[in-house]
Amino acid sequence: MRIIEQKPTLIVLMGLQASGKTTFFERYLRDRGYVHINLDTLKTRNREILEVTRCLDQSLDCVIDNTNPTKDDRRRYIRPAKDKGYHIIGYFMQSKLAGCLERNDRRERQVPKKGILATFNKIEMPSLEEGFDELNFVSIEDGEFSISKWIEDEI
């Protein structure tokens, strides 16, 4: 009998502030045992790096819940996870700017509008070439998420 070893998983969430990333994590991933890594919660990049390193060293499944708008932002997680043999899945939140601004206005802790606009202006669409094993679009309508497979030719 041959036992198949399952790779640990790194999930990288991508999208504007108030696009639904944390809600998506809470609804679909928290109860599956993923470690939640969020710069807003950890407060400093150093703490975030320590937590990512801990997860990778212990082969823990984890979710990076940050805006991750650029390839460089995503590379800081993908490269070391690939080196540790992780399966890497990306979820790109397809929220419209107007929808994010509206949701942000309803938040208790609001992000300044100029911060959301700055993130919007630097978004680079992800690609499988970055090292993702899987990429998905996530849309949100009336508080419900819809997930579809990434098709690079349609971007």
Residue ranges and their predicted role:
Residues R54-D57, D83-K84, E129:
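Conserved catalytic network of the ASCE P-loop NTPase/AAA+ motor domain
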Residues Q6-P8, S59, G85:
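A general structural motif
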Residues K84-L101:
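Conserved phosphate-donor/acceptor-positioning beta-strand/loop module used by diverse small-molecule
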Residues M1-M14, S19, R27, D31, ...:
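Conserved GTP-binding G-domain of TRAFAC-class P-loop NTPases and closely related GTPase folds
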